Regions:
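Non-catalytic nucleic-acid-binding interfaces of large nucleic-acid enzymes and RNP effectors
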Residues: 13
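Structured mid-to-C-terminal alpha-helical surface segments
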Residues: 2-8, 18-219
Length: 219
């Protein structure tokens, strides 16, 4: 959403954070979808959350299916994951003009979608660094981080403060961490990086990420 389809890793799902309870957020979203917009309506259906080992329940994203209809007929389902506000990541937003979406909406005769509130970049970077250096299989964050830093001027000092707070809050791995290759990353990374303006070799991408962590840690 931040950079447009031509410059980002394609994904069909949507992640969001809320300062309220995720269930209450889903209720409000469901009410808005029921009211509809330009012939589109929808409903929010809860899914069973994951149960990752040694991860407190309150840290686990709450999954939902957003089932959209157009003129009363099923159209598509969008997987949605709602997280809680950990360290103020839902307190403020970067408001972004959706140029690609605006053009697509205009071509279809729909009103402009307007601006979208996105999580501030320093929080996104901190969360992705925490994920890619954790025990999970998050090689995709190596691609996302390169896209973010090649397309945005990110405040390293602010990112450092956010990383320190997030890593201390989650109490999983210490800051600064180290990215280490995991089984299967070669093939997964190659598939994700193909056709994108990012480092094509996973080993070199890991070196880049660890150098980035050092830059942030000393900012």
């Amino acid at each position: 959403m931040r950079y447009g389809n031509a410059r980002t890793r394609y994904t069909t799902d949507l992640d969001t954070a809320t300062a309220t309870d995720p269930a209450a957020y889903a209720d409000l979203l469901g009410a808005a979808l029921a009211r509809g917009w330009e012939g589109f309506t929808g409903r929010v259906v809860p899914r069973e959350p994951a149960h990752p080992k040694d991860v407190p329940e309150e840290y686990v994203m709450r999954p939902f299916d957003v089932r959209l209809s157009y003129l009363g007929k099923p159209w598509c389902t969008v997987p949605l994951e709602v997280g809680h506000d950990e360290i103020g990541d839902a307190d403020a937003a970067d408001w972004i003009d959706l140029e690609d979406a605006d053009a697509a909406f205009a071509a279809l005769g729909l009103p402009s979608p307007g601006r979208a509130p996105l999580m501030p970049l320093e929080h996104q970077v901190a969360q992705k660094l925490h994920a890619v250096t954790g025990t999970g299989d998050r090689v995709r964050d190596l691609v996302d981080l390169q896209v973010m830093f090649s397309n945005s001027d990110i405040d390293l000092a602010a990112t450092k403060r956010t990383c320190e707070r997030l890593f201390a809050y989650r109490q999983r791995q210490a800051w600064p961490p180290t990215v280490e290759a995991r089984e299967g990353w070669d093939e997964q990374y190659q598939a994700l990086a193909e056709g994108m303006v990012v480092i094509q070799d996973v080993g070199e991408a890991i070196e880049w990420a660890n150098a980035l962590i050092s830059r942030i840690a000393t900012a």
